[in-house]
Amino acid sequence: MLLSSTAIYAVGASGMYQWSVALSGYVSTETGKAPTAYLWMPEGCQQVKAVVFAQQNMTEEMIFKMPVFQKRMKELGVGLIWVAPCFTQNWNPTTGCQQTFEEMMVGLAGQSGHKELEHVPVIPLGHSAQATFPWNFAAWNPDRTLCVISFHGDAPRTNLCGYGTANVEWGRVRNIDGIPGLMIEGEYEWWEARVRPALAFQMMYPNSCISFLCDAGSGHFECMPETAEYIAMFIRKSLEQRLQVDGSLKKLTPQDGWLACRYNPDLQPNDGDGAKDDIFTINQRPQAAPYIDYQGDRHDAFWYFDQEMAELTEARYAETRGKLVRPLEKPTYTISADGKRVSVNVPADVHVEVISGPLRKVNNHTFEVYPYESGLDNPKRSFTSWLIAIRDGDSKYKRAVQPIEVKFPNPLKK
């Protein structure tokens, strides 16, 4: 299959990505044409150590465009690949997604001159409806997966896939043993039924290395800078502990890491079953400890690389525990007559950020439309943008967040 580039440098209206290829072996149901894979390489990087691979959905865009995340990826020598529209939600190999991926990597290697892309380790990352595919990608690509990031997402082999239908069956022999995986769930989207499959997975696969972070003070839609930093640290630890001199990946042994107690919410009720969840106070929580020394219930604990990662997780939980919730009213917005600007009405103590879509921030109240990478031929995504209003927390209150869906007139419907 021949993959064609849309440009040589600064492809797409955002100017973020340097190279792109059309995935001409796949036709998107959203646009009726091939998706495009965009590649960002850190400035001055001669050879990347790994790439983060995500597909168009929602918060993946926000994470990739965050200056702090790009800064950390540059420090680590890690590239970014974003595909729009997506070519798979569940990574079911019977659909041809594996071949599409492999041809994409060869095409991007050829376009960019970074031949290492043909075999470089991959970090699959997905949010919400895309949060299941990273686990399944790893199960079918265990020797190439550096680590897994399921953001505001799903447990491996979950029965509650973010895309709303059945998961892909792994069979008896497939697993992700020794591959570090990170599941993140927002505090305000908390649902016990999403967490339980992750705990059960560890019992079923005792050689798995599953980390968990409750994104305290956050909901479903947004990524805060401290969470982007956490993800970057997870990637750094993966590189440090797994990447060998010859480019191969060392399998980790969970017994060499740390264990820390799962998150217990202080917001009730949270899972709709009418039953209160067990709540640990800070003093009652079992102390995080090396795997062999952990004194808590191992069935209620998650794995972490080391003391630094386990204690950072505990610190995130302690930061908001016991604080009050101060709801944030949903902001209103207006679109200019020419359809090129959006004005958002928020109080002075609230800031607004872009999650996804064809908007970029001018100031805290003004956002301008630009023809971003998705183009203007996708009825599902080209005319919708998501913003997030944020009131930062303090010593008394948790952070408050409120998503804003902005819909533009769709000329395709005329």
Question: What are these model-predicted stretches?
Answer:
Residues 393-401:
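Short, exposed coil/turn segments at beta-strand boundaries within extracellular/luminal domains
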Residues 8-51, 122-137, 141, 149, ...:
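A domain-start/cap signature at the N-terminus of enzymes
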Residues 208, 216-338:
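Alpha/beta-hydrolase-fold serine-hydrolase catalytic core, especially in secreted/extracellular enzymes
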Residues 407-413:
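Extracellular interdomain linker/stem segments of modular secreted and single-pass surface proteins
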